[in-house]
Amino acid sequence: MAKEKTRVKRKERKNISSGVAHVNSTFNNTMITIADAQGNAISWSSAGLMGFKGSRKSTPFAAQMAAEDAGKKAMEHGMRTLEVEVCGPGSGRESALRALQSVGFTVTTIRDVTPIPHNGCRPPKRRRV
């Protein structure tokens, strides 16, 4: 007997005017998540998701592409204004922020929420190349 096909439910279009963009930029990758005011993720993207592999994921261009992708997905839900929270020491911080502005968002606030240790864990040893 033939198996009945399951229908894939189409993503419903939410009407959200403002939200928060979390830009997490590490030394190896850049991840952008756009959420509503309650913290529910609307769209997300990363440099790895955009097809970059290895050391190319950590470039500012990869972060720009990821931010544009996440921004376009969020704009489909009607989002127009953003608060941006930047976290991490990576190279894609500024380029991701500029890319979000170029997509068409009005950025109201920019917050740096990078955790700073008060002499916490021992850092990794220096690289000898």
UniProtKB/Swiss-Prot annotation:
One of its GO terms (cellular component) is ribosome. Transmembrane segments: none annotated. Belongs to the universal ribosomal protein uS11 family. It comes from the Bacteria. The keyword Methyltransferase does not apply. One of its GO terms (molecular function) is structural constituent of ribosome. InterPro entries: Ribosomal_uS11 (IPR001971), Ribosomal_uS11_bac-type (IPR019981), Ribosomal_uS11_CS (IPR018102), Ribosomal_uS11_sf (IPR036967). Pfam families: Ribosomal_S11. The keyword Repeat does not apply. This is Small ribosomal subunit protein uS11. The lineage of its organism: Bacteria, Pseudomonadati, Pseudomonadota, Alphaproteobacteria, Hyphomicrobiales. Located on the platform of the 30S subunit, it bridges several disparate RNA helices of the 16S rRNA. Forms part of the Shine-Dalgarno cleft in the 70S ribosome. One of its GO terms (biological process) is translation. The gene is rpsK. Part of the 30S ribosomal subunit. Interacts with proteins S7 and S18. Binds to IF-3. Keywords: Ribonucleoprotein, Ribosomal protein, RNA-binding, rRNA-binding. PROSITE patterns: RIBOSOMAL_S11 (PS00054).
